[in-house]
Amino acid sequence: MNKLTIIFFTILLLTYIIVEKEALKIEDLPEPESYKKAKQLAVKDANGDKRAEGIALDFLRQNRRNCTVNCDLVLTCPLLTPECCPKKNDDCLKLDTVKNG
């Protein structure tokens, strides 16, 4: 019984890894100029503090990812994901998060 359980969860884990690896995500698209400017501002506002810079860039990355399915999440969604907000273009519609979301 334990062997079967381990085999089942191993197969399940491998399937999950393969699906996640093959999924088209927002990070796979080229970064728009407005997002690049937002990243530059985040780095500038950190004033050389690497920890604050990392937090700010992570926050921008998460908002960009979450804005693909919900443009009303934050006011800056059109700047972070112009592919998806306010109108979804072809690049946005190809994303797996948008298809499944």
From Swiss-Prot:
One of its GO terms (molecular function) is toxin activity. Expressed by the venom gland. Contains 3 disulfide bonds. Residues 1-23 form the signal peptide. It comes from the Eukaryota. Keywords: Calcium channel impairing toxin, Disulfide bond, Ion channel impairing toxin, Secreted, Signal, Toxin, Voltage-gated calcium channel impairing toxin. One of its GO terms (cellular component) is extracellular region. It is found in: Secreted. Voltage-gated calcium channel inhibitor. Belongs to the scoloptoxin-10 family. This is Omega-scoloptoxin(10)-Ssd1b. It comes from Scolopendra dehaani (Thai centipede).
